[in-house]
A protein has these predicted regions:
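Non-catalytic structural scaffold of enzyme domains
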Residues: 48, 64-68, 104-105, 129-173
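Contiguous, glycine/small-aliphatic-enriched amphipathic segments in soluble metabolic enzymes
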Residues: 1-138
Length: 173
């Protein structure tokens, strides 16, 4: 039977942050798996580490790409060095590289039509900075990779309520 649910690519974000906690707790609810086919771009080892530290039973399958995602189950595409270490709340350049690797793989598979949307977990905007990523945040990076010269707009939605951000990364003083 073919799975016609929306295929949601979810980037792991900063492995030392709240990303995996939010993802794993969200998909601990079986109802969420009825709504979509979720694919985490990240590390199965890091996901398992967070699952254990949170005492969750959220199961996932390890796949090579979103094309192998298992319906009604969380899948993880490994796009991170297996030796990366998790140190909760600690800024780390390797965690920044892992966040970027996940984002790049999600964008690649989005372009190939393997996923329908990309959801990004929070990054550390300092540790992700590199020659490949010199942007204030996800939105600008995704805009450059997928925007075809058009501007991107971040939208937050719930049912019939939508909020679009008019400015980004401008501090209120």
């Amino acid at each position: 039977m073919e799975d016609n649910k929306i295929r949601v690519g979810i980037t792991q974000g900063d492995i030392n942050g709240v990303g995996y906690e939010v993802i794993l707790k969200t998909f601990a609810d079986p109802v969420m798996l009825e709504l979509c086919t979720p694919i985490i771009y990240g590390s199965p080892k890091v996901a398992a580490y967070h699952r254990k530290s949170l005492d969750l039973s959220t199961n996932f399958s390890i796949v090579n790409s979103a094309s192998e995602a298992v319906p009604n189950r969380l899948s993880v595409v490994n796009c991170t060095d297996d030796e990366v270490k998790v140190e909760f709340s600690k800024p780390d350049v390797e965690a920044g590289k892992a966040a970027l690797g996940a984002l790049e793989k999600a964008i690649e598979e989005y372009k190939e039509g393997m996923i329908d949307v990309i959801v990004t977990a929070p990054i550390n905007k300092h540790t992700i900075q590199s020659e490949e990523f010199a942007f204030p945040g996800h939105t600008e990076y995704i805009e450059q990779k997928l925007g075809d010269g058009e501007k991107a707009l971040m939208i937050l939605m719930k049912d019939d309520f939508r909020v679009a951000l008019v400015t980004g990364h401008i501090p209120v003083k």
